[in-house]
């Protein structure tokens, strides 16, 4: 296990460098991370490195006990660090839903999808979660406004960590107010990109690569952690509330469909 831990640590270090080497790589990571938004940032990074197409990951015991699904013979787990600070030097292994199959005890895995008819409700959820949104002309604009509000409210909780981590990075000789401006801008765009990706919004039609050009400044593991954890944490806040809204709407629709069928019969 020690040898595998070392290999995964090396993979993590390489991936940290790769994802900020250019805007496209960072966007690819965000598009992967949005599908497993409840994971820690460091877990999302390792899932991206090993299975960028994973849509829903759990440990084998959770697949068995919670959803009655069994992992396919020969399936390879996705190795992640057991704890954020890596103090125990242990790995946890996740399996994607595509690595599992149903049993007689299976329960539905609640993977939600955005529908056009849910747009008004989702925008209302974003506003109730992150505050008043000025531009609600489209779902993309509402998400962008929510991301700005969220960054404004939450960036101070992470900014000090970035200030402490600038040594040896592109930010080392940069004034703190400029560092803060760049940080807030990249986090805002990254949170919006994650939420848009999960909701099926055309990110290419909204963002340009130039919107993420400053990600290359987060060129040490410490500065990238400050970016990654803030982005992941804030995006999770929004996506968790959106998930509740969409799940409730899906449940209402099933009830209505059931009533219609009863009336027809």
PLM regions and their residue ranges:
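N-terminal accessory/interface modules of nucleic-acid-binding and processing proteins
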Residues: 1-265
């Amino acid at each position: 296990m020690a040898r595998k831990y070392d290999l995964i640590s090396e993979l993590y270090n390489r991936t940290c460098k790769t994802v900020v080497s250019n805007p496209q790589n960072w966007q690819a990571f965000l598009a992967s991370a949005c599908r497993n938004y409840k994971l820690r940032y460091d877990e999302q990074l390792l899932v991206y490195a090993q299975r960028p197409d994973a849509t829903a990951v759990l440990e084998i015991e959770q697949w068995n006990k919670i959803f009655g699904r069994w992992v396919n013979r020969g399936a390879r787990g996705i190795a992640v660090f057991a704890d954020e600070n890596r103090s125990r030097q242990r790995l946890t292994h996740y399996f994607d839903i595509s690595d599992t199959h149903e049993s007689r005890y299976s329960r539905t895995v609640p993977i939600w999808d955005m529908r056009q008819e849910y747009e008004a409700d989702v925008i209302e959820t974003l506003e109730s979660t992150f505050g008043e949104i000025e531009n609600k002309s489209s779902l993309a604009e509402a998400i962008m406004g929510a991301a700005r509000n969220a960054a404004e409210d939450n960036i101070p909780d992470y900014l000090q960590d970035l200030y402490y981590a600038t040594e040896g990075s592109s930010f080392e000789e940069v004034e703190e107010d400029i560092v803060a401006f760049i940080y807030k801008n990249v986090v805002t765009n990254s949170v919006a990109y994650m939420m848009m990706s999960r909701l099926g919004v055309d990110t290419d039609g909204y963002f340009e690569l130039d919107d993420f050009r400053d990600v290359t400044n987060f060129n040490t593991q410490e500065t990238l952690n400050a970016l990654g954890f803030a982005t992941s944490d804030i995006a999770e806040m929004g996506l968790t509330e959106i998930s509740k809204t969409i799940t409730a709407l899906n449940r209402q629709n099933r009830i209505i469909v059931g009533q219609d069928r009863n009336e027809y019969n």
